[in-house]
Structure formats: structure tokens, C-alpha cells
């Protein structure tokens, strides 16, 4: 199943190793809007574009930081367990279904509405005790230059959940995923 980085790995397997892959399933559907549809957008597509615009302008700083200066954030996070916790829990607040409107406007949300305190502390501890914040940030730096949007022909399942960061309409997804068997 591919969500977040799992989506990138899943799509790489489905696109580059189709002879050894029976199919893929992603819930972060990565692709590009079809320019030919821009004059005939559905209401959902307009909402998807607005959400992506909001994400790029207001919620993408972590990604830019890690993709361009991974060591800086890596040293900062390796220096403070509280800093490490804040960095991660802030993402849980923004990216879990814990009381947000799509687009990030908080309506009293708290991550514990979606995850237990223990689950969040387990995640923070995994990064802190292994001192892996910098290497995790470098994944962005190493990977962004090699991302592709090549076609995928293996059978593909796509799940769209209400507050996913990335959303495509089916017609846009079909530009990349050529054999969608579940939507």
C-alpha cells in the first residue's frame, strides 16, 4: 500500500518492475492535472487545485527545508528531544483527521483525536533514539531530483480519503495510471 513515501516506492516498483509486480495500491495519488481540462474543471477539481495551492503556500515548508538543507534541520532535531517531538507532532496535528477542515483550518483539532499519545511518542522515540532525523531529511534531498511521473501500466487501486494532502480526479489520474481497477 502506498501512502506518502510508500506511494513513491510503490509507483517506482509498478512503473519500473512491471514484470515482477502484480499490481499496486496507493492512497497518495501522484500525478499532474491534464492541461487540456483546465477550461472544463469540475467542482472537485477546482477544490483539489485550491487545496494544492494552499499546501504549496502554507504547509510545504518542512519539505522545502528537508529537500534543500537537510543537515540544518537534522542537527537541530538531533540536539533536542523536545524539538524532535514538536517537529513530528505538528505534522500529526496537520495531517491526521483530528478536527480540521480540508485546507488546514483548525476547528479545535488535536492529534489525540486520531492517534494515541503512546503511538505519537513511539514515533518520536524511533527518530530520537536512532538519531535518524538528519538521514530522514536527506531522503527528500536525495529523492526529489529523481522523482518521475512516468506511466504505470500494472493494475492499480487508488483510495482517496477526505483530508489527503494530494488529490487528483480520476481523469487526471488516468494520465499516469493506465490500468485503474479500483477507485
Predicted regions and their residues:
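Short, surface-exposed, polar/charged, turn-prone segments marking secondary-structure boundaries
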Residues: 28-29, 50-55, 104-105
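Detector for Asparagine
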Residues: 16-19, 27, 60, 131, ...
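Conserved hydrolase catalytic core segment
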Residues: 1-49
Amino acid at each position: 500500500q502506498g501512502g506518502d513515501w510508500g506511494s513513491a516506492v510503490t509507483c517506482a516498483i509498478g512503473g519500473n518492475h512491471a514484470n515482477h509486480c502484480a499490481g499496486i495500491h496507493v492512497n497518495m495519488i501522484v500525478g499532474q492535472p491534464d492541461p487540456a481540462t483546465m477550461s472544463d474543471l469540475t467542482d472537485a477539481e477546482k477544490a483539489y487545485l485550491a487545496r494544492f495551492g494552499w499546501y504549496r503556500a502554507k504547509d510545504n515548508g518542512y519539505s522545502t527545508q528537508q529537500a534543500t538543507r537537510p543537515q540544518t534541520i537534522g542537527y537541530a532535531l538531533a540536539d533536542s528531544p523536545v524539538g524532535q517531538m514538536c517537529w513530528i507532532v505538528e505534522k500529526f496535528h496537520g495531517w491526521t483527521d483530528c478536527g480540521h477542515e480540508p485546507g488546514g483550518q483548525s476547528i479545535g483539532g488535536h492529534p489525540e483525536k486520531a492517534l494515541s499519545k503512546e503511538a505519537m511518542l513511539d514515533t518520536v522515540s524511533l527518530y530520537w533514539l536512532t538519531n535518524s532525523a538528519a538521514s530522514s531529511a536527506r531522503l527528500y534531498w536525495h529523492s526529489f531530483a529523481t522523482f518521475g511521473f512516468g506511466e504505470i501500466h500494472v493494475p492499480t487501486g487508488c483510495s482517496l480519503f477526505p483530508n489527503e494532502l494530494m488529490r487528483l480526479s480520476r481523469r487526471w489520474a488516468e494520465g499516469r495510471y493506465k490500468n485503474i481497477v479500483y477507485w
